[in-house]
Amino acid sequence: MKSSAIFFVCIVVATFTAQAFDIKDDTKICGVCSQPVHVKIAISIQTVGSRDLDLRPAPELRDTLKYQIQYCPKCGYCWPDIAKERKREKIDHILNQPIQYDDIAALFARAAAIEIADNAPSFASFMLFLKAAWVCDDLKNKRKSDDYRRLASHQMDLYMERDAIARTTGDNYLTQVDVVRRIGDIDKARRLLAIADLYAKESILPLILAFQKKLVENKDTGRYTVADVLTLQQ
């Protein structure tokens, strides 16, 4: 994944206006059971500000998490776009597990499990677990957000093991550094930073690398943005 792209990895359809985002009702056909599913989609989103170092976007886009996952109450399938087709036999064991439709973090986690079962550990499964963590951040549930960050980090490990391009992409390491630093896994953050030194060469990545090194050495587990890198490094 190119470094110029990863800064915008979570972007959904956005229109830059002065208005708050709108919600559109829609009906889609479930990609597993072929039944109609009523969904709500966030549109006309204005994003102003700097993204977090773990890729979470600035407001208003950061406030649309519950509209970034869709759930079929008929079969239990969930995915960012419920119309994505999948073979039920590969994910049936996941769909049969009980889940609360309004537990947004659990829906993201189920989508990650579906991706792993249907394909393999990937950047998508990493991001889905990370979004589950963001939901728990907003709910002030530190224990659950830490659990989901650990799962996200493990997915990135597995993804980079199987993908040669992914494991030589500097921003993958820097994103994962932020994920593990936030949960206080300083040892793993240091190991990742040592590898990131080899690959974090493009654009703003060297600045983020230096910033993360300071945070890790200070055992700082706080949330920071790209803007913080540019201002606090000066």
Q: Model-flagged regions — what are they?
A:
Residues K84-Q97, A105-K140, R167-R182:
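Amphipathic alpha-helical repeat scaffolds of TPR domains
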Residues I186-E202:
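TPR/TPR-like (Sel1-like) alpha-helical repeat modules
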Residues T175-K188, K213-Q234:
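Alpha-helical linker/edge segments of TPR/alpha-solenoid repeat scaffolds
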Residues Y159-T169, L198-K213:
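Boundary/linker segments of alpha-helical solenoid repeat arrays
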Residues A18-H93:
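N-terminal cysteine/histidine-rich coordination modules
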Residues I114-D118, C136, Q155-D163, Y199-K201:
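Alpha-helical junction/boundary sensor with strong preference for TPR arrays
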Residues F7-T15:
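Bacterial N-terminal signal peptides
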